[in-house]
Amino acid sequence: MQSLSHAVKTSLPNYLSSLPVPDSVGGWFKLSFKDWLALIPPTAVVVGIGYISYQALCPAAQRKSCSGRCNDNIRKHEAKVVDMIDIENIADKAAFCRCWKTKNWPYCDGSHGEHNKNTGDNVGPVVIKRN
């Protein structure tokens, strides 16, 4: 406990008072390279605390976080979505959805294109062809 007390009461104030913080706006332009390097650690701490606070308290940051769920709307009442398609019923080829965005489940309708554009993903359909 004594080391924490020493750090808070003595070391931290001494460190902060030794930082080369200028008194005027023009003083920032007169700082040397060594002075700028000395300002990096406290700046990184302040930016880190600000970022963590933003992530914890800002509703917009929390809204963007993903739940990890890939199926947002297809047959949600079922415990597991399974489709059996007889290969004999496929004409020459069929494209099946892998992104869960289609309105024509289980067939692909190209909905992944907008998803890929918005998220930078590269998902596409599974294409089955008959020989």
From Swiss-Prot:
One of its GO terms (cellular component) is mitochondrial outer membrane. It holds the Pfam family zf-CDGSH. PANTHER family: CDGSH IRON-SULFUR DOMAIN-CONTAINING PROTEIN 1. The chain crosses the membrane at residues 36-58. InterPro entries: CISD1/2, FeS-contain_CDGSH-typ, FeS-contain_mitoNEET_N, MitoNEET_CISD. Its main location: endoplasmic reticulum. GO terms for molecular function: 2 iron, 2 sulfur cluster binding; metal ion binding. Keywords: 2Fe-2S, Endoplasmic reticulum, Iron, Iron-sulfur, Membrane, Metal-binding, Transmembrane, Transmembrane helix. It is a single-pass membrane protein. It is found in: Endoplasmic reticulum membrane. Belongs to the CISD protein family. CISD2 subfamily. The gene is Cisd2. This is CDGSH iron-sulfur domain-containing protein 2 homolog. The lineage of its organism: Eukaryota, Metazoa, Ecdysozoa, Arthropoda, Hexapoda. GO terms for biological process: intracellular iron ion homeostasis; mitochondrial transport; regulation of autophagy. Its cofactor is [2Fe-2S] cluster. Residues 1-35 are lumenal. Coiled coil: none annotated. Binds 1 [2Fe-2S] cluster. [2Fe-2S] cluster binds at C97, C99, C108, H112. Residues 59-131 are cytoplasmic. Gene3D superfamilies: CDGSH iron-sulfur domain, mitoNEET-type. The keyword Membrane applies.
